[in-house]
Amino acid sequence: MSKINLLLLCGGGSAEHDISLLSANYFETSLAKSEQVNVLRVVLDKFGQYQTAAGDDCELTNNREIRFRDETKAPWPVDYVIPCIHGYPGETGDIQSYFNLIQLPYFGCESEASSNCFNKITAKMWFSALGIPNTPYIFLNQYDDEAIAQTQAALENWGSIFVKAASQGSSVGCYKVDDSSKVAGVLKDAFGYAPYVIVEKTIKARELEVAVYEYQGEVVATLPGEIICDSNTFYTFDEKYAKSSKARTDVVAQNVPADISDQIRAYAIKAFKGMKLRHLSRIDFFLTQDNEILLNEINTFPGSTPISMFPKMLQNHGHDFTEYLSLVIKGQLAAK
């Protein structure tokens, strides 16, 4: 069998561009263990330009090939692509639509599932439709006096709130608000990141994560892992990725009753199947002191940085990441 020409596409136009590059390192290292693929790593910059790791300017054409600006270099045909892009245009579903248009097989969730999960408002509507408990919320579609009044009413009712840009990841455009005098400014900032904003009740709870992925025809949900932050903070962008972060992670959360763990995993699989996710996801939950389970969010292309939970949970579940990737890629190309 001839080797598969695999395009590892990373970067993108969001605030998570640099995190995407770190995740791509993990994919590149894992793929290097396989003798079945030729890997070409290409960075998509914030202006939509492509460049190889060697610094060659290039583009992905509608003929499913990488064409170089230096015309002395032969085009590189692409059999398969891994869009290792956090945020826009990867997790938003935009780039998947393009792959569908040019009939290029790709790793990860399809366009509609990606879009539905990335938009926090759409996602919560899906959670409720599937009968999966989630945090109380309101959503806003413009910054005006009415939006400020609605948010202040929510704060008065709930005591503490999170104001979030509806279409951002990694806690970008996310603010915890306890003081009504801060509402107007925070709303203005959030609307600077997205055209829609969601306001959620602050939940005092443990933050649990489940890796959910397809393996040999089955949907697998790992035991919940846990993000442990300082009690007075939340899991901000810096807490996730900065070297000075004080947050820590447990690949398997401690002191979670077996029946609660089973219910979390059941909800995770229900969300994965109900929202028609594909290949991989990380599904995040809150667990309150009263053992109430609330689905927080779904990440359709979870990070694979040195501190990321998804690859650790997959490995802890007994699966090798390189073998997992190979099974997905070969299965997808065989069904083409």
Curated annotation (Swiss-Prot):
Q: What is its main location?
A: cytoplasm
Q: Write down the chemical reaction(s) this protein catalyses.
A: 2 D-alanine + ATP = D-alanyl-D-alanine + ADP + phosphate + H(+)
* Residues the record lists as binding Mg(2+) 1: 284, 297
> What does the record give as the organism's lineage?
Bacteria, Pseudomonadati, Pseudomonadota, Gammaproteobacteria, Alteromonadales
* Designated name of the protein: D-alanine--D-alanine ligase
Cellular localisation: Cytoplasm
Give the protein family. Belongs to the D-alanine--D-alanine ligase family.
Entry keywords, A to Z: ATP-binding, Cell shape, Cell wall biogenesis/degradation, Cytoplasm, Ligase, Magnesium, Manganese, Metal-binding, Nucleotide-binding, Peptidoglycan synthesis
Tell me which InterPro entries the record gives.
ATP-grasp (IPR011761), ATP_grasp_subdomain_1 (IPR013815), D-Ala_lig_Van_CS (IPR000291), D_ala_D_ala (IPR005905), Dala_Dala_lig_C (IPR011095), Dala_Dala_lig_N (IPR011127), PreATP-grasp_dom_sf (IPR016185)
Which Gene Ontology terms describe the biological processes this protein takes part in? cell wall organization; peptidoglycan biosynthetic process; regulation of cell shape
Any Pfam family the entry gives: Dala_Dala_lig_C
Instruction: State the Gene Ontology terms under molecular function.
Output: ATP binding; D-alanine-D-alanine ligase activity; metal ion binding
Annotated ranges, domain ATP-grasp: 124-330
Recorded metabolic or biological pathway in which this protein acts = Cell wall biogenesis; peptidoglycan biosynthesis
GO-annotated cellular components:
cytosol
Q: Which HAMAP family match?
A: Dala_Dala_lig
UniProt lists the gene as: ddl
Q: What does this protein do?
A: Cell wall formation.
Q: Which organism is it from?
A: Shewanella sp. (strain MR-7)
Where, in this chain's numbering, is Mg(2+) 2 bound? Answer: 297, 299
Q: Where does ATP bind?
A: 154-209
How and how many cofactors are bound, per the record note? Binds 2 magnesium or manganese ions per subunit.
Asked whether the keyword Magnesium is assigned, the reply is: yes
| Enzyme Commission code | 6.3.2.4
Q: Which PANTHER family would you find in this protein's record?
A: D-ALANINE--D-ALANINE LIGASE (PTHR23132), D-ALANINE--D-ALANINE LIGASE A (PTHR23132:SF25)
Q: Domain of life of the organism in this record? A: Bacteria
Q: Which cofactor does it need?
A: Mg(2+); Mn(2+)
Does the keyword Heme feature in the UniProt annotation? no
